[in-house]
């Protein structure tokens, strides 16, 4: 009996991609015809086969049954749509770089914003969590110039590096026994003044801990700091219904943050690289004018 093969991309999916490519091409059929840049089909095949052979030297993170890596494979539809878009290679830096894809980006970002309870927001997609956090902390520095940013010792290491790159003071604070930001330590530091932004991590990459957002929000009422939530890894876990009560309590309060980072290329099942930065107050767009 022949052993069934494990397929990365089903042949039927490739057939659908071919149909979609034909439809895409028909939208530009008024352009002058061009001959192929390379008529050497054998040469092209040789190069692609070499690439395919070298790509086999990877762990099978892409397989849906692989449980030894924190990231999940892209959804088949996302993978095909990504390939389809690469044929026109849009650039959403401005409408002239990608008119249709910019509109689709706005729709996707709005869906992510609604996931955390925001109907009104400002945000966009970017290359990943590092760039998204950089932008959020840059805005935080504009809102509270000269004030310090704090995060837990379990927060992603890039917060410290980002703060240094932006010329902002940064401090790491101790965690409790569950790896969460210790709110008693945070309160003592707030009493010393000079804190402009608190970074709460909802799903640390090392141990999956969730900072106590409700307790941090109570401190915000007293001290008036800006709350940025790094949910690059953990953001999509808010959709599941079997979270522990403490974790659910934090997810249910995400909408009260000033800014949030979520990575669709993690548990949003999108291809690399796809991060998302969101701001609750669209007025921070004033910092983008140039």
Language model: regions and residue ranges:
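Conserved beta-loop-alpha segment that forms the PLP phosphate-binding cup at the N-terminus of a helix
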Residues: 104-110, 121-145, 158, 162
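PLP-dependent aminotransferase-like
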Residues: 144-193
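Active-site phosphate-binding strand-loop segment of PLP-dependent enzymes
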Residues: 183-228
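N-terminal entrance/gating region of PLP-dependent enzymes' catalytic architecture
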Residues: 1-119
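Active-site nucleophile and cofactor-binding loops and adjacent substrate-binding regions
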Residues: 97-101, 123-130, 151-153, 201
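Short acidic, glycine/serine/threonine-rich loops at helix termini
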Residues: 135-138, 160-165, 208-212, 237-243, ...
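Active-site C-terminal subdomain of aminotransferase-like
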Residues: 243-290
């Amino acid at each position: 009996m022949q052993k069934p093969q494990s397929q990365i991309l089903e042949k039927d999916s490739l057939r659908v991609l071919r149909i979609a490519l034909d439809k895409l091409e028909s939208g530009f059929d008024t352009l002058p015809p061009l001959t192929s840049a390379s008529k050497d089909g054998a040469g092209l095949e040789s190069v692609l086969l070499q690439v395919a052979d070298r790509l086999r030297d990877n762990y099978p993170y892409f397989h849906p049954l692989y449980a030894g890596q924190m990231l999940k494979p892209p959804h088949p539809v996302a993978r095909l749509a990504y390939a389809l878009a690469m044929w026109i290679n849009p650039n959403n830096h401005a409408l002239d770089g990608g008119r249709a894809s910019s509109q689709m980006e706005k729709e996707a970002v709005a869906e992510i914003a609604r996931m955390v309870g925001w109907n009104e927001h400002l945000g966009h997609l970017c290359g990943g969590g590092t760039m998204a956090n950089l932008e959020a902390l840059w805005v935080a520095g504009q809102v509270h110039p000269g004030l310090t940013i704090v995060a837990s010792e379990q927060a992603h290491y890039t917060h410290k590096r980002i703060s240094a790159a932006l010329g902002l003071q940064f401090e790491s604070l101790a965690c409790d026994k569950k790896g969460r930001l210790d709110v008693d330590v945070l309160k003592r530091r707030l009493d010393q003044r000079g804190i402009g932004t608190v970074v709460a991590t909802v799903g640390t990459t090392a141990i999956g801990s969730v900072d106590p957002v409700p307790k941090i929000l109570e401190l915000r009422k007293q001290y008036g700091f800006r709350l940025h939530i790094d949910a690059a890894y953990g953001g999509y876990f808010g959709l599941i219904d079997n979270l522990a009560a403490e974790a659910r309590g934090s997810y249910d309060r995400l909408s009260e943050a000033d800014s949030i980072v979520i990575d669709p290329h993690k548990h949003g099942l999108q291809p690399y690289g796809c991060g998302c930065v969101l701001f609750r107050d669209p007025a921070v767009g004033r910092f983008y004018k140039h």
